[in-house]
Every structure is written in C-alpha cells, then in structure tokens.
Regions:
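Short, flexible helix/strand-to-coil boundary loops that buttress conserved ligand/catalytic motifs
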Residues: 48, 76, 99
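Beta-hairpin "wing" of winged helix-turn-helix
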Residues: 67-87
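Glycine-/small-residue-rich active-site loops that bind phosphorylated ligands and cofactors
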Residues: 39, 80, 94
Length: 127
C-alpha cells in the first residue's frame, strides 16, 4: 500500500495550497456562511435570506468551494420540488468556531475600529 506524500504547509509561501484554503474560509462570504452554519442545518434559500447582500450566484459558488474543501456537507433529497440542505462537517465546525470568535471580536471592537478609521480619514484629508 502506497503512503500518501504529506504536504508541508506554509501559508506564507505563494505556491502553497494552504493560501487558497485561507482565502476560501476568510473571504467575506466564506466566513459568514461558516458562522451561520454553526447554528444549524440550512436550505439554500434560508442561507440567502439570512446572509444579507449575498447573490444567489455567489452563495452557490461559495457553498460549492467550501464543500470541495471538506468544510460543508451538501445533502440533496430525491423529492419534487428539489430539497437541498447544507451543514458543517466536523472539520467545518472546527474552523467555523474560529471564524465565529473573529466575528464576535470584530463586533465587540467595532466602535473603536470605526473611530480609528475616522481619525485616519481626517488625517489623510488634511495632508
């Protein structure tokens, strides 16, 4: 039996596949989908309604990417009309918890961050 060659991950390396995965989970839509799916299993239309501003095309693309990475499980039922549900895999739950911590940190510190942005914007306009 052949042993699979383990990749040495280096997210700082431009050629490392880990960088692409980082992009998938840390993109706006990827991170929001992961955080929402921590709540429960959702149907496509429920996700679209829950995540304001996401287009159907972007939702479908992002779900497909997260499924290919092994973070999201897509379950299609053989019924009419079609019924498809999305949930997190164990690995998806693991990474989603980290993304949730990040989103909670952002919400907690939003006032300070926006104040910093205003100060920086004023400095730029004065120069």
């Amino acid at each position: 039996m052949a042993r699979s060659k383990l990749l040495k991950a280096d997210v700082l390396s431009v050629n490392c596949p880990s960088r692409q995965i980082l992009d998938h989970i840390s993109s706006t839509w990827g991170s929001l989908i992961l955080v929402v799916l921590l709540e429960r299993t959702f149907r496509f239309s429920e996700l679209r309604n829950k995540i304001e501003g996401i287009s159907e095309k972007m939702l479908a693309q992002t779900l497909q990417t997260l499924e290919q990475d092994g973070f999201v499980l897509r379950k299609a039922y053989p019924v009419i009309p079609p019924k498809v549900e999305y949930s997190l895999t164990p690995m998806g739950k693991s990474v989603a918890k980290h993304m949730q911590e990040l989103t909670l940190w952002i919400e907690k510190n939003l006032a300070q961050i926006t104040e910093n942005q205003k100060k920086s914007s004023k400095k730029t306009k004065q120069n």
